[in-house]
Swiss-Prot record:
PROSITE patterns: PTERIN_BINDING (PS50972). It comes from Moorella thermoacetica. The gene is acsE. InterPro entries: Dihydropteroate_synth-like_sf, Met_Synthase/Corrinoid, Pterin-binding_dom. Ca(2+) 1 binds at K184, G222, D224. Its cofactor is Ca(2+). This is 5-methyltetrahydrofolate:corrinoid/iron-sulfur protein co-methyltransferase. One of its GO terms (biological process) is homocysteine metabolic process. Changing N199A: 20-fold decreased affinity for methyltetrahydrofolate and nearly abolished catalytic activity.
Length: 262
C-alpha cells in the first residue's frame, strides 16, 4: 500500500499562507511529519486561491525537495502548473490527475510519458462522477486504452474510481469497491488503483474511523495507493495490518514500524 500524504495542500490555512508568503517552514514541516508517519509520496496542491499557479507549484516542489526525496504527486487542474512542477522534480513524479475526456487525455498522457511520471486517471468525464460501477469501469477501460495508445506503462497508470462522502452518497461505496476489483481484470499487467481516501468521510462524524475502515475494505478489493492522512497513526496501523492479513507482506513483530520505514 502506497500512502500519498495529503497535507501539503493550499486548501489548508497554514499551507495557503505559506504559499502566499513563500514561507517554506510549514511545507517542510508537513513533508517531514508525513514521511515519518509512513507516507512514501507527497501530494502537492497549491489550492484554488493562488493566482499564479505555475510559480506556486514550482516553489512547492523546490522547498519540499529540500527536505524530502519522496515521490511528489503534482495535484492540479492547471496543466501548465503540472508541467512546470515536473521540470523541477529531481526524482520520478506522479501527475494528479486526468479524467477520461479526450482533450485532457491527449495532453496529460504524453506529458507523463515525456517525464517518466506516473499518472492518476479519474473514472469520470465532464458530465461528473458516475453512480454505478459499470460506468466507472467503462471510463477505466478508456484510460487503459489511452495508456496503450500513448505508451504509458500500465504499472504507471493509477485509476481512481472516485469515492464520495458517506453522508451524502452512501450508495457509492459498494460501487467503488466493486470497481476496484474489476479494474484488475482490464489488462495484464493490471493498472494500479488509488483513492482520495479522506473524501469518504468529508463532513462526517468520526472521520478517522470511517477512513481507516474503508481503507481496509478497499485494500481487500485490490487498492494499491491512497491519498490520505499519513499522520493518522491508527490509519497507518490499519494499512500495515491489512497488508499482513491479505498476505501482501511477511509478518514480523515490528510490522507497523517496518511499514513506516520501508
Amino acid at each position: 500500500m502506497l500512502i500519498i500524504g495529503e497535507r501539503i495542500n493550499g486548501m489548508f490555512g497554514d499551507i495557503k499562507r505559506a504559499i502566499q508568503e513563500r514561507d517554506p517552514a510549514p511545507v517542510q514541516e508537513w513533508a517531514r511529519r508525513q514521511e515519518e508517519g509512513g507516507a512514501r509520496a507527497l501530494d502537492l496542491n497549491v489550492g484554488p486561491a493562488v493566482q499564479d499557479k505555475v510559480s506556486a507549484m514550482e516553489w512547492l516542489v523546490e522547498v519540499t525537495q529540500e527536505v524530502s526525496n519522496l515521490t511528489l504527486c503534482l495535484d492540479s487542474t492547471n496543466i501548465k502548473a503540472i508541467e512546470a512542477g515536473l521540470k523541477k522534480c529531481k526524482n520520478r513524479a506522479m501527475i494528479n490527475s486526468t479524467n477520461a475526456e479526450r482533450e485532457k487525455v491527449e495532453k496529460l498522457f504524453p506529458l507523463a510519458v515525456e517525464h517518466g511520471a506516473a499518472l492518476i486517471g479519474l473514472t469520470m468525464n465532464k458530465t461528473g462522477i458516475p453512480k454505478d460501477s459499470d460506468t466507472r469501469l467503462a471510463f477505466a477501460m478508456e484510460l487503459v486504452a489511452a495508456a496503450d495508445e500513448f505508451g504509458l506503462p500500465m504499472e504507471d497508470l493509477y485509476i481512481d474510481p472516485l469515492i464520495l462522502p458517506a453522508n451524502v452518497a452512501q450508495d457509492h461505496a459498494p460501487e467503488v469497491l466493486k470497481t476496484l476489483q474489476q479494474i484488475k481484470m482490464l489488462a495484464d499487467p493490471a493498472p494500479k488503483t488509488v483513492l482520495g481516501l479522506s473524501n469518504v468521510s468529508q463532513n462526517c462524524q468520526n472521520r478517522p474511523l470511517i477512513n481507516r475502515t474503508f481503507l481496509a475494505m478497499a485494500m481487500a478489493c485490490g487498492l494499491d495507493a491512497a491519498i490520505a492522512d499519513a499522520c493518522d497513526e491508527a490509519l497507518i496501523e490499519t494499512a500495515a495490518t491489512a497488508e499482513i492479513l491479505l498476505n501482501q507482506t511477511v509478518y514480523c513483530d515490528s510490522f507497523v514500524k517496518m511499514f513506516k520505514t520501508r
